[in-house]
Amino acid sequence: MRSAKVGVARQLETKKPQTGRKISTSSRGTIHSQQSQPEDIQMKYTRKELKEYRQLFNMFDTDGSGAIGNEELKQAMISIGLHANKAEIDNVIKEVDADGNGEIDFEEFCACMKKSQNIVKSTNEELIRECFEIFDQDRNGIITENEFKYIAKEFGDFDDELAEKVFRELDVSANGHLSADQFATIVEDYLLNDPKHDIDTGDSDVERYDDRHDDRASPMPNHLSTVPE
């Protein structure tokens, strides 16, 4: 299922914000993540968040001093998918660097990561809404099979057979359309995962689709003509 979702969302590449790299684990990061955290931090973040933040923090705290500089923090923010301009990143840092000493301790780092992730989430939600409107030509709140196939063929270089196969796999309720929630799940899956996967339809057209799209993205205009009934 996931591979087909990737195939649908790949045609939205030009709108897609860059996703952050996966946080690598190391023995050093694992040791630090198992250390006890201050109680107030444990109340603000989930155990999973603290583990990921600690691993990422340790990647940049190379001297083990317990603090990182602003430049390292910027790189950490970018690595989780926040591709804002310098002024926006500086504003986030200014908000979390409570003592203003230009060094970020782990507690400040956690606050910055959480804020950055919220910004990325908001950006992704706006992206999903815009993409849904591109497919939903008649603005009735659902994407019909004809609407899906039209966009997929016109701007994703799908042929009829591949477009139909992908739609049928995504239409898990088999009612002939995709709801806004279903579409959001498809695009969120694409934004959060590596798009370099094949569509598992068992058809040679899939490989040709991947070959055509490895090095370029399909343009997505702001306005499209009416989809044929």
From Swiss-Prot:
It comes from the Eukaryota. Keywords: Calcium, Metal-binding, Repeat. Ca(2+) 3 binds at D136, D138, N140, E147. Residues 1-41, 194-229 are annotated as: Disordered. InterPro entries: Centrin_CML-like, EF-hand-dom_pair, EF_Hand_1_Ca_BS, EF_hand_dom. Pfam families: EF-hand_7. One of its GO terms (molecular function) is calcium ion binding. Residues 194-217 have a biased composition (Basic and acidic residues). Residues 48-83, 84-119, 123-158, 159-193 form the EF-hand domain. Ca(2+) 1 binds at D61, D63, S65, E72. Ca(2+) 2 binds at D97, D99, N101, E103, E108. This is Uncharacterized calcium-binding protein B0563.7.
